[in-house]
């Protein structure tokens, strides 16, 4: 539920809090966070963002909730990519195992990628435990 500090789905918030608590106990080998970006490389004009295998199992893109009927978001919402000029453009993304490939028209040499880096961002990247990735900015390794 976008733009609501008091979401209706309280059970999901409680489930996530319980996972964080369980992780504190010795011997509890559970995933308590969404996909965590670890590295960005560039190949063929596209950014390749690698995620920690511990958090990226079953990683997938999910359609974001529409912010309004006039401007529905798609499952590619929330991603921006910047070239060497430093100007961020809305981007497309696709999951390949524990990697997300990000690209946009007009960006041939990616420098940086931002995910969910807005006020009230679209959240579209989840792992197999349906835990969302936190917002991040990542720079390409050169």
Give the ranges of each region predicted by the language model.
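Catalytic cores of secreted or luminal carbohydrate-active enzymes
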Residues: 1-77
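C-terminal beta-sandwich/jelly-roll accessory domains of carbohydrate-active enzymes
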Residues: 54-142
């Amino acid at each position: 539920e976008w733009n609501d500090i008091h979401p209706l789905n309280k059970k999901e918030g409680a489930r996530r809090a319980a996972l964080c608590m369980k992780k504190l106990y010795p011997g509890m080998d559970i995933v308590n966070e969404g996909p965590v970006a670890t590295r960005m490389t560039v190949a063929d004009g596209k950014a390749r963002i690698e995620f920690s295998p511990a958090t990226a199992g079953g990683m997938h893109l999910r359609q974001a909730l529409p912010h309004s009927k006039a401007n529905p978001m798609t499952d590619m919402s929330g991603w921006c990519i910047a070239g060497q000029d430093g100007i961020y453009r809305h981007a497309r993304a696709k999951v390949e195992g524990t990697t997300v490939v990000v690209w946009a028209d007009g960006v041939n040499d990616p420098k940086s990628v931002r995910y969910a880096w807005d006020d009230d961002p679209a959240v579209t990247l989840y792992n197999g435990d349906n835990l969302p990735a936190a917002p991040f900015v990542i720079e390409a390794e050169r």
